[in-house]
From Swiss-Prot:
Binds hydroxyproline-rich sequence motifs in fibrillar, glycosylated collagen, such as the GQOGVMGFO motif, where O stands for hydroxyproline. Interacts with SRC. Interacts (tyrosine phosphorylated) with SHC1. Its EC number is 2.7.10.1. It is found in: Cell membrane. SMART domains: FA58C, TyrKc. Belongs to the protein kinase superfamily. Tyr protein kinase family. Insulin receptor subfamily. Tyrosine kinase involved in the regulation of tissues remodeling. It functions as a cell surface receptor for fibrillar collagen and regulates cell differentiation, remodeling of the extracellular matrix, cell migration and cell proliferation. Required for normal bone development. Regulates osteoblast differentiation and chondrocyte maturation via a signaling pathway that involves MAP kinases and leads to the activation of the transcription factor RUNX2. It is an enzyme of class 2 (transferase). Glycans are attached at N121, N213, N261, N280, N372. Induction: Up-regulated during osteoblast differentiation (in vitro). Up-regulated in cartilage from osteoarthritis patients. Changing Y741F: Reduces autophosphorylation. Abolishes phosphorylation by SRC. The gene is DDR2. This is Discoidin domain-containing receptor 2. The modification Phosphotyrosine is found at Y471, Y736, Y740, Y741. Residues 22-399 are extracellular.
């Protein structure tokens, strides 16, 4: 029966993958309340054109709230076609809004006012206001029919806005009152407009017309489109057949914006993107149609130019040629690396490869390039990761999805029936054999329960256990499987304290340590890797947490007023990570730890901050993270310097290195044989020196049975003289959002760095950290110029892990970097071995890198 939970686990992981949208913003997921009903939007950000009295002011227009007189009510009755009255909400930052909710004034049964209809106006800058319209041009939305029911309305298409106005509409003179809520999520792209040539018409054989215009563009439209957003940012990716559409009741071709080669005199289409501020760009993803049988292909090359604020376009463009695909007609995302270029505007020229070029989505992975030191710390909450009752599943492509799920379920049921039938007959045979043998002999077992463990295939002695990972099992369908039906005994049950732990990501102890010198791996069943402040959390043995739970934190309390905030590095559901500068840190640090600066000089530190509105579980997890960090004492692991836990917001202060993370550091450098004379280089010796330090830090973590779970160059900080320290907040940074795969809002996974067993079985171990080290080593020797498996989509990466599991020689490995010697690439390949017990330990990796350095 061990296969049944395994197969169900794999199905559980794959179902969200099958149904997940391919666009960066998925309207089916981005449906979180933005703070009217919950109170996160403050009163001063809710304004109105007028109010009937102080008790019906704008601040009382919160959905499902009975404060004041129960709603916002304008001063005078609303007249037909008189659109002067409005309720306005300022979100302070751009948001992707997919749903609105309205309600009238009930006031405990005393109110009878409501708005039967309303319009939505929105603005991204507070000056230019846009009237929302649906895909057929209708602007008026149906409102409430009574004063108490909540009426939810999908915005199709969704909008990107900072300011939103609700404008009540009536067909006769009447008093109206409104309570409202907005649903959506933060608009992380930062894109405020794109300018492009207007889309065109595709005429099919027979005369049918496919309209490929941007029908919901909210800017000016003529021969070109200017100062607006539309279908390229609506979160809906087009189908393989551009004559079909995801959306109901719209015309064929709606999902795509398309251009004909003849309309472009230079052989390319130029699109200019304007952003909210200067940003650091990692990648651009373009969803393209490739129905080459109808003359449609992805672009053959793109050239992108960059501009900061009102300056001229920079002359050195990024050029990215593509390998055309004349075999697979599927639509796909094309990822274009932007090499951390800084800009507030990007102009891209997409070159035709055939008669037509069609796009359905364009997204950017970026982070703000700088932060204003005088800005107040943000207080707006992040979208919760818990299940939202408003969440709706994208019903597009429903029949195909249902067919796939039904087929998978039938296959699983058939396998389960076969296994149960086999076990039934096996028990019958066992009973018969027992009856025959009971008169002849008695079999008794005297193995001590605290020093033996049974695998699925055989009983194991202590010496055997130490060398086997607990997920390296022999499956029943393999010929070498033998079931010891007469000798299987029940495993000892866990005590309640061992079975459950209050710290997310804690490893459950599966066996005692073997003899000294025999390595074993800590093992954890983990789905969500993210901590409360957005970074990954270490997977820690339960026995270690039990020891830490009774200890006080041996770290000094630091005066909060001495922190000077420089930049926000990242954020999570309940907290943020900031880059700060402090003076006088030497008075508070551990006496055994030396700061890498001269005395009395300011020190750069990373501050993890828990927001004051965090719940009790988040606070407990944050304090446990402090206890874990306080135990880490290694020169290649960031050090916990001090804490601020006497009052809110709780903070932990850790080291930060002057050269930032290794990913950005290497992307600013080139190999020593580079032809560029104006770019700094890093020698092969220094690359190996940094890799050796990463191995040393991971060797220390593995000695504690700690599992990092997100080892990558983005989580390695670089100091003076190429010193390296391993950190844990890369996951919180929007700059690296493209490195993570989000499964229906439940988990954020770095799948391009994860081992096959981590993706398919949810197993995170020291062995899976070894796999990630191999990918990190590959990043280092490629100078972080591209993502691992950049030629594969996220779905193809997951498919490739299945090939590693099947081990039939069809798996794809990362290629050998140009400056990487054979010995180092051989080490990488050993980290990616299918069987975990065949991968090297970090002690072996560290020793091997040291020996190579001495050659």
């Amino acid at each position: 029966m061990i296969l049944i939970p395994r197969m169900l686990l794999v199905l559980f992981l794959l179902l969200p993958i099958l149904s997940s949208a391919k666009a960066q913003v998925n309207p089916a997921i981005c449906r979180y309340p933005l703070g009217m009903s919950g109170g996160q939007i403050p009163d001063e950000d809710i304004t109105a054109s007028s109010q009937w009295s102080e008790s019906t002011a704008a601040k009382y227009g919160r959905l499902d709230s009975e404060e004041g007189d129960g709603a916002w009510c304008p001063e005078i009755p609303v007249e037909p076609d008189d659109l002067k009255e409005f309720l306005q909400i300022d979100l302070h930052t751009l948001h992707f809004i997919t749903l609105v909710g309205t309600q009238g004034r009930h006031a405990g049964g005393h109110g009878i006012e409501f708005a039967p209809m309303y319009k939505i106006n929105y603005s991204r800058d507070g000056t230019r206001w846009i009237s929302w319209r649906n895909r057929h041009g209708k602007q008026v939305l149906d409102g409430n029919s009574n004063p108490y029911d909540i009426f939810l309305k999908d915005l199709e298409p969704p909008i990107v806005a900072r300011f939103v106005r609700f404008i009540p509409v009536t067909d006769h003179s009447m008093n109206v009152c409104m309570r409202v809520e907005l649903y959506g999520c933060v608009w992380l792209d930062g894109l405020v407009s794109y300018n492009a040539p207007a889309g065109q018409q595709f005429v099919l054989p027979g005369g049918s017309i496919i309209y490929l215009n941007d029908s919901v563009y909210d800017g000016a439209v003529g021969y070109s489109m200017t100062e607006g957003l539309g279908q390229l940012t609506d979160g809906v990716s087009g189908l393989d057949d551009f004559t079909q559409t995801h959306e109901y009741h719209v015309w064929p071709g709606y999902d795509y914006v398309g251009w004909r080669n003849e309309s472009a005199t230079n052989g390319y289409i130029e699109i200019m993107f304007e952003f909210d501020r200067i940003r650091n760009f990692t990648t651009m993803k373009v969803h393209c149609n490739n129905m080459f049988a109808k003359g449609v292909k992805i672009f053959k090359e793109v050239q992108c130019y960059f501009r900061s604020e009102a300056s001229e376009w920079e002359p050195n463009a990024i050029s990215f040629p593509l390998v055309l695909d004349d075999v697979n007609p599927s639509a796909r995302f094309v990822t274009v690396p932007l090499h951390h270029r800084m800009a507030s505007a990007i102009k891209c020229q997409y070159h035709f490869a055939d008669t037509w070029m069609m796009f359905s989505e364009i997204t950017f992975q970026s982070d703000a390039a700088m932060y204003n030191n005088s800005e107040a710390l943000p207080t707006s909450p992040m979208a919760p990761t818990t299940y939202d009752p408003m969440l709706k599943v994208d019903d597009s492509n429903t029949r195909i999805l249902i067919g796939c799920l039904v087929a998978i379920i039938f296959i699983l049921l058939a396998i389960i029936v076969i296994i149960l039938w086999r076990q039934f007959w096996q028990k019958m045979l066992e009973k018969a054999s027992r009856r025959m043998l009971d008169d002849e002999m008695t079999v008794s077992l005297s193995l001590p329960s605290d020093s033996s463990m049974f695998n699925n295939n055989r009983s194991s002695s202590p010496s055997e256990q130490g060398s086997n990972s607990t997920y390296d099992r022999i499956f029943p369908l393999r010929p070498d499987y033998q079931e010891p039906s007469r000798l299987i005994r029940k495993l000892p049950e866990f005590a309640p304290g061992e079975e459950e732990s209050g710290c997310s990501g804690v490893v459950k102890p599966v066996q005692p340590s073997g003899p000294e010198g025999v390595p074993h791996y800590a093992e954890a069943d983990i789905v969500n890797l993210q901590g409360v402040t957005g970074g990954n959390t270490y997977s820690v043995p339960a026995v270690t947490m039990d020891l830490l739970s009774g200890k006080d934190v041996a770290v000094e309390e630091f005066p909060r007023k001495l922190l000077t905030f420089k930049e926000k590095l990242g954020e999570g559901q309940f907290g943020e990570v900031h880059l700060c500068e402090v003076e006088g840190m030497e008075k508070f640090k551990d006496k055994d730890f030396a700061l890498d600066v001269s005395a009395n000089q300011p020190v750069l530190v990373a501050v993890k901050m828990l927001r004051a509105d965090a719940n009790k579980n988040a606070r407990n997890d944050f304090l446990k993270e402090i206890k874990i960090m306080s135990r880490l004492k290694d020169p290649n692991i960031i050090h916990l310097l001090a804490v601020c836990i006497t009052d809110d917001p709780l903070c932990m202060i850790t080291e930060y290195m002057e050269n930032g993370d290794l990913n950005q550091f290497l992307s600013r450098h080139e190999p020593p044989n580079s032809s560029s004379s104006d770019v700094r280089t890093v020698s092969y010796t220094n690359l190996k020196f940094m890799a050796t330090q990463i191995a040393s830090g991971m060797k220390y973590l593995s000695s504690l049975n700690f599992v990092h779970r997100d080892l990558a160059t983005r989580n390695c900080l670089v100091g003076k003289n190429y010193t390296i320290k391993i950190a844990d907040f890369g996951m919180s940074r929007n700059l690296y959002s493209g490195d993570y795969y989000r499964i229906q809002g439940r988990a954020v996974l770095p799948i391009r760095w994860m081992s096959w067993e981590s993706i398919l079985l949810g197993k995170f171990t020291t062995a899976s950290d070894v796999w990630a080290f191999g990918v990190t080593l590959w990043e280092t020797f490629t100078f972080c110029q591209e993502q691992p498996y950049s030629q594969l989509s996220d779905e193809q990466v997951i498919e490739n892990t299945g090939e590693f599991f099947r081990d039939q020689g069809r798996q794809t490995y990362l290629p050998q970097p140009a400056i990487c010697p054979d010995s180092v690439y051989k080490l990488m390949l050993s980290c990616w071995r299918r069987d975990t017990k065949n991968r090297p330990s970090f002690q072996e990796i560290h020793l091997l890198l040291l020996q190579q350095g001495d050659e």
